[in-house]
Every structure is written in C-alpha cells, then in structure tokens.
C-alpha cells in the first residue's frame, strides 16, 4: 500500500514538473511601440526645404494628463521603448526650433508654444509707435512647429513575441506664414534700415488642441526688401489671429533714413486677417522717404538721437 502511494506521488510530481517546464509566452508591463511620422509640407507661403532634424514624442496619461515617458526620434519616426500598459494621449513636435519655445511640457492640457521678446534696445527704436504702451509685448516671429496628436491610445500588457503596436501620426504646423506687399515706396535710396511690427496677434498656441491664445502680442520682423519698382515685400510668421482678440491689427512700418531720422507709418490691417486664405497683406499707398538734410544745404544736421521721429496714420 505504501509503495502504491509513493508511486502515485512520484507520478504527480513528475506531472507538475512537466507542466512547469512548458514554454509559455512571457508578458511584460512595459512594451515597445513603433511610431511612424509624416510631416505635412503643404504650407501656405512657406516652402519646407528640409525635414526637421529631431522630433520629440511624449506619452501622457490620458486620465490625468501627466507626463509618463518620451523619446526623441528622426522625422520619419522610430521605436519608443518601455511603455507601461495604460491609455495615453500622444503628442509629437519638432525639437529643432530657434525662436519657438515650449512651456509647461509635463502636462498634456497645458503645454504651449510661444516665442521670445525682442531686446529692449530694439523696442526703444520702436518707441515712436506712440499709440502703444510701455508694457507692450513685442516678440520675434515663431519658427514653424509641426505637431501631431493621438488621443485615447490604449497600450496593453502583451507577450514579448506579440506583434508590435504601431502608431501612425501626421504632424502639421501650428504657425502661419504671411506675405506683405506695399506699393509704393519712393526715396528708397534714402533708407538706412527698416523694420515692421504687426500688433494684436495670438501670443501662443496650446499645441495639444491647436488653440490660439486670446492673449495677444506684437510680432516684429525686419526682412523687408524694396525692388526697383519701389514695391516693398516681406514675410513673417505668426501663431495667427483669433476672433477672441478684439484689439485691431495695426502694421507699423519703421524706416530710419541715412541721417538717422525715424519715419513710422501706421496702417490698420485688421480686415486683412479675416477670411484671407492667401495670407497676403496688400497695402496700396505711396510712402515717401525724403532725402535728409545735409550740412551742404545750409541747415543744422543734428545727431541721430536728436531727430524727432515722424508718425503717419495711413487710411486705406
């Protein structure tokens, strides 16, 4: 009897060992994800000369909006490792901008893009745009920021030999490129330098929602060119305009002549930001920069900082 019991116990132990030694798929709470990226290059008034050099891919907890993990990928995408199993909101953007800054990056609901203020020395040169207050926020125009989003993406616990989870994400810019055309500038030979400011444009963009802020800034740019026909052209970038901004959009053209005198022309362009798919601001007026007085004219030539700057409001 005892031998029979022992024999049965031995068989039972061998059966347990056989079961324990069977190969089973391993599961893990962390799992790699393949992210495929596509950059939308069809942008009004802007030619994408090359792909971004680096993309940041952030996984946020979709319930709390809190940062969980991230990876830095080439513009075509790649693998993101060690993704804990849960539901995510995924946000991707290019990480190679010079003038566009990202803030509050640890929370999906608050992350936003903005740009930096111009130096006080530049702002002083624009002081004669007298209708603006000392606390006016004048910023550089932003670089294009390509943003992609996926919401409520569930990453399960899976066996290590299961097929990869693949996410396809398209990234589109949250920045607009606008053109400026002014006809006509006379006295171009008398211009030493020129710059421009457009007021009351969105100061930032909540990139998780592509939401323009109602807090506005003035955008500074200085890439104007005047051709032989006296046509001034320029390009500037902006986070755009929203109807939540009730202040007018005023273009200030700021010229400094070769003697150092400032000439400022203010033009209300509010109507041109509404229903304008071309994103071109056209100004059909003649602006004259007169030849500055010289000592040979028998007049007194003041120092640069003694000149009064000239303000002109142009009605179009």
Task: Label each PLM-derived region with a short phrase.
Residues 30-48, 182-187:
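Short amphipathic, basic-aromatic surface patches that mediate peripheral association
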Residues 22-25:
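Bacterial signal peptide processing site
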Residues 137-227:
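A sequence/structural signal for flexible, mid-protein segments enriched
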Residues 54-105, 109, 190-273:
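Tryptophan-paired
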Residues 244-316:
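Hydrophilic extracytoplasmic domains
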